[in-house]
């Protein structure tokens, strides 16, 4: 099949090219790469709750909402997303982790992140995950919903988020195959430079208003779809009905076999 060759190393381009001419076989009559299967993103026009019955004591919950298509010309949004994720739901010092696990003990695992698509045909998604005991499902879902609806303001957390982003960029080194993989990811988005430069410069000027504006525009709004994995014997369906129409899925529905 037709292909490309990526190289990272000490040799210059002309030396590598001459070696490839000599050593690389199968350079002619190459087949076209088959078109990849396109998976169409579903619409989220009404609240739904998808439930999969699985024999387990815990409940796994994902609250999902769909955002806009990625816009490669709006690098400022990329910076806002990275800052909000770090502050709100991306790590152990985030608001979501501290509120849901540390303060209220409502989850053994929890996060909330606004995704960064890997190509220009994909949309942003807000993904908020809760791993909790089945008997804490109601409290956990209420707690997460409250955080999504109204973002708590904590100056110390905001400062830590800025410092974490700056420190990561200062110390992170892209070397060897990582250079190639990062280049490929950027190319898929139509970007021809290292956007971490923009992030490092932008985060200096971000403040609590920046976080609130992004949260109100992209997190608080939007139709939410809830996905729940757990034992149907332990899940309270009356509680789940409050979040949308319930649809039970079989393992065949999920995996296709």
Question: Model-found features: residue ranges?
Answer:
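Active/ligand-binding-proximal structured segments within catalytic/core domains
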Residues: 63, 73-89, 94-98
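Short beta-alpha junctions and helix-cap segments that line functional grooves
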Residues: 35-36, 212-215
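Short proline/glycine-enriched turn/loop segments at secondary-structure junctions
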Residues: 51, 214-217
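An aromatic/glycine/proline-enriched structural segment found at the starts
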Residues: 3-71, 228-257
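Solvent-exposed, non-transmembrane alpha-helical starts
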Residues: 72-77, 137-140, 237
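M16 family metallopeptidases and their MPP-like homologs
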Residues: 2-8, 59-70, 97-213, 221-229
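A generic secondary-structure signal for well-formed alpha-helical elements
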Residues: 15, 23-31, 91, 104, ...
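A C-terminal, polar beta->alpha supersecondary segment
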Residues: 93-94, 179, 253-257
